[in-house]
């Protein structure tokens, strides 16, 4: 059976750290930022780490060979 391919869309959205955690950009900042608080805008600027359960699903289904 051939190797499972990595999803191209997932390659652009997720990064796997050396310790195996999955980093992703914060969501909800495409439009409508005028009504958001400054704290929300500041916090959404960076990246966040997925929970272990979500990271396991992402790696298993979308990034089987890593990046």
Swiss-Prot record:
Species this protein is from: Bartonella henselae (strain ATCC 49882 / DSM 28221 / CCUG 30454 / Houston 1) (Rochalimaea henselae)
One Pfam family from the record: Ribosomal_L35p
Family of the protein in this entry: Belongs to the bacterial ribosomal protein bL35 family.
UniProt lineage: Bacteria, Pseudomonadati, Pseudomonadota, Alphaproteobacteria, Hyphomicrobiales
GO biological process: translation
Name used for this protein in its record: Large ribosomal subunit protein bL35
Gene (name only): rpmI
Keyword RNA-binding: no
InterPro entries named in the record: Ribosomal_bL35 (IPR001706), Ribosomal_bL35-like (IPR021137), Ribosomal_bL35_CS (IPR018265), Ribosomal_bL35_sf (IPR037229)
Any Gene Ontology CC annotation: cytosolic large ribosomal subunit
Alphabetical UniProt keywords: Ribonucleoprotein, Ribosomal protein
GO molecular function: structural constituent of ribosome
């Amino acid at each position: 059976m051939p190797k499972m391919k990595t999803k191209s869309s997932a390659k652009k959205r997720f990064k796997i750290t050396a310790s195996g955690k999955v980093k992703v950009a914060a969501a909800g900042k495409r439009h409508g930022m005028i009504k958001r608080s400054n704290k929300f805008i500041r916090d959404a600027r960076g990246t966040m780490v997925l929970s272990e359960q979500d990271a396991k699903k992402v790696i298993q289904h979308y990034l089987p060979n890593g990046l």
